[in-house]
C-alpha cells in the first residue's frame, strides 16, 4: 500500500487502509456476512485460474473435484452459490458505506480525518479503488468505471447533516 500511496502522491496509506475496512463494512452491510463455503469455492477457483462464470459448465460436465462439486450442491446448486459468491458493490454503494463507517468511527470529525488523508470528495474514493484495481489488489466488474464515484454526494452536506448528537439528562 505504501508504494501505491507514494506513486499517487496525494493520499495517505491510512486512506487505503480505511478504504479496505470500508469495503468490508459495505459488503457486509449489503450482502451480509461472508459464507465460508462460498469463500472456499472462490479461493479454489482463483488458485486454479478458473473464471467463476465457467463454474456452471464445469459442474454440468462433472469436471470439478468431488469436494468442490459437493460444496456447490451443499449450498443449493449453481444459482445459489453464484449469488453467495457475488460480493460486488457499486461505486455509489461503496461511497455511502464509507460515509457511514466514517461517521461511526469519527462522528462530526469524519470530514477532517478524511481530508487529512487527502480524501475530499467521492471521486477520491474512486481514485483509491482504481489504484488498487490497477495494482491487482482489487477486482472490478466490466461495467465498473471511475465515473461511478463522481458526485455521489457532497462531503460538506453528507457528513454534517447525517450525524445526530443526542443529549440525555444527567442524573
Predicted features, each with a name:
Residues 1, 78, 106-109:
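Short acidic (Asp/Glu) and glycine-rich catalytic loops that position anionic groups and cofactors
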Residues 2-13, 85, 89, 116-119:
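Generic amphipathic alpha-helical segments used as scaffolds and interaction surfaces in large
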Residues 54-62, 116-117, 142-150:
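Short, charged early-sequence alpha-helical segments and their helix-coil boundaries
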Residues 59-100, 104:
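Intrinsically disordered, low-complexity acidic Ser/Thr-rich regulatory segments
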Residues 87-141, 149:
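Amphipathic alpha-helical packing elements
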